C-alpha cells in the first residue's frame, strides 16, 4: 500500500499539498510515483506564473509515460524544485520530501478548493486499485 501522510491534503489527480502560511508546497503522491515508475525528467512550471486549480502546471516523464501535473489549488508560482532537473528520481525516492515540485502563493481561500483529506485520498487510491 502506498504511503498517505495524514498531515497533507490531496487532489483527486494525485498531487499532495502542504499548506503553511499562505504557501502551498506541491508534489505527487507515493501512489502516483509508484504508478508512473522510474521518473526520468520533470518539466517545472515558470516562476511568477498564475494558475487556477485544475490547470496543467508541470509534466513528469517516466520510463512508462509522460504525465501532466495539475495545480491542486489556485496561486502564483513562488518556487520550483530546481534540484529535480539533475535528480528527477527524487520524485520516486522521496515524493513527500526532496521530490516536491513547486510552491504556490495561494490566491484564494483553501476552504473553497476541492482538496481531499488523507483519509479521503486513501479511500480513492483503494477504489482505483480494484
Locations of the language-model features?
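Charged, amphipathic alpha-helical coiled-coil/dimerization segments
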Residues: 74, 78-79, 85-92
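Histidine-anchored, small-residue-rich loop motif
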Residues: 71, 85, 106
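Acidic, low-complexity mobile loops and tails
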Residues: 1-56, 89, 93-130
Amino acid at each position: 500500500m502506498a504511503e498517505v501522510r495524514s498531515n497533507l491534503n490531496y487532489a483527486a489527480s494525485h498531487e499532495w499539498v502542504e499548506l503553511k502560511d499562505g504557501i502551498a508546497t506541491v508534489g505527487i503522491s507515493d501512489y502516483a510515483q509508484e504508478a508512473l515508475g522510474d521518473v526520468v525528467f520533470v518539466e517545472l512550471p515558470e516562476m511568477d506564473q498564475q494558475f487556477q486549480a485544475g490547470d496543467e502546471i508541470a509534466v513528469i516523464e517516466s520510463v512508462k509515460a509522460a504525465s501532466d501535473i495539475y495545480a491542486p489549488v489556485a496561486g502564483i508560482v513562488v518556487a520550483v524544485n530546481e534540484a529535480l532537473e539533475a535528480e528527477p528520481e527524487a520524485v520516486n525516492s522521496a515524493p513527500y520530501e526532496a521530490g516536491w515540485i513547486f510552491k504556490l502563493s495561494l490566491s484564494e481561500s483553501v476552504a473553497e478548493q476541492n482538496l481531499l483529506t488523507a483519509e479521503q485520498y486513501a479511500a480513492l487510491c483503494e477504489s482505483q486499485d480494484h
